Amino acid sequence: MMYNVTIRETLARTVQIEADTHEDAEFAARSLYRKCDIVLTDSDYIDTTFRVHGVPSYYKSPNNDFTLIKGDCVDTLSKFNFGFDMVFADPPYFLSGGGISCQSGKVVCVDKGDWDKPTTPEEMDAFNLRWLASVREHMKENATIWISGTHHNIFSVQQQLLKLGFKILNVITWAKTNPPPNISCRYFTYSTEFIIWARKSQKVAHYFNYDLMKLLNENKQMTDVWRLPAIGKWEKSCGKHPTQKPLGVLARLIQASTKPGAWILDPFSGSATTGIAANLLGRKYLGLEIEDEFLSMSKARREEIENISKKDEYVKRLAKAKIIIPQDNIFVTETIEERYGVPWL
């Protein structure tokens, strides 16, 4: 005889169990939930994804240590739960008001795009509060965030960080060793940018690789003034991004605040310099970007360092500049648990 047995869990469901008596059917149902040890082998796994609500990716590297997703950062982050070890953000500076500058001896327009047009202080504050609140929800309790800016936006960012409960650790001054000249000759040449370093929690301790930073600074404590060059031509082999950051800056802050294998988020991925630096240093990366042009450029940059000679060239350049100490086998090897533990496809 076939009996319908109701099993009450968080939700009730009915299964069909073939048995001679009601008691036998109930016993069979209970046996489905007995405690037991299960040992799985490779043959028990199938090539599938164990997620119903996975977020589709624009691109994933062959070993899944570099993922790009197309979409607005706030909207995309609302679709999944995941805790990152570190965040780097290069949000709009809101400075593209038709100004000019000098690059390679030529006068050029400094407009970056419509996304960087000046706005009101109130709108800037609301924008920064919105994306910072969203990112904070996806940071581990001991995670830190780095945010770059200039005087145009950095004070707004600082105020929103405090409002959300972050603890500001440092404000790094990036002093560019090769800044473009000021062609108006009416004020000092802009040669610096600021990078706020903050941790999510006031009380939970963060990670700081103090010894490595000291080693990279000739065994002296590293200060909050970093004298590093602006982006070099060798970093633009896959195209030009109007606000691309140099690998040297990203490599330093990634090493300072994460361990190998850490997950790093960039909500304004751009040309994915954060991701390239992360992978060169054995970290994993998720970048969010809305522009197809920049997604394509980022994909090309990541594919470029699949070439061992190109990867070695990048590492040697960074090592020569005393930004990193070369390591062997610096690409991350992914485990099955890690593959199915992320909420993107």
Locate predicted features.
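PRPP-dependent phosphoribosyltransferase catalytic core
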Residues: 293-345
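Short aromatic-glycine-(Arg/Gly/Cys) micro-motifs in beta-strand/loop hairpins
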Residues: 1-11
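Short, mixed-charge low-complexity intrinsically disordered segments
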Residues: 35-56
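Core catalytic lobe of class I
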Residues: 56-297, 343-345
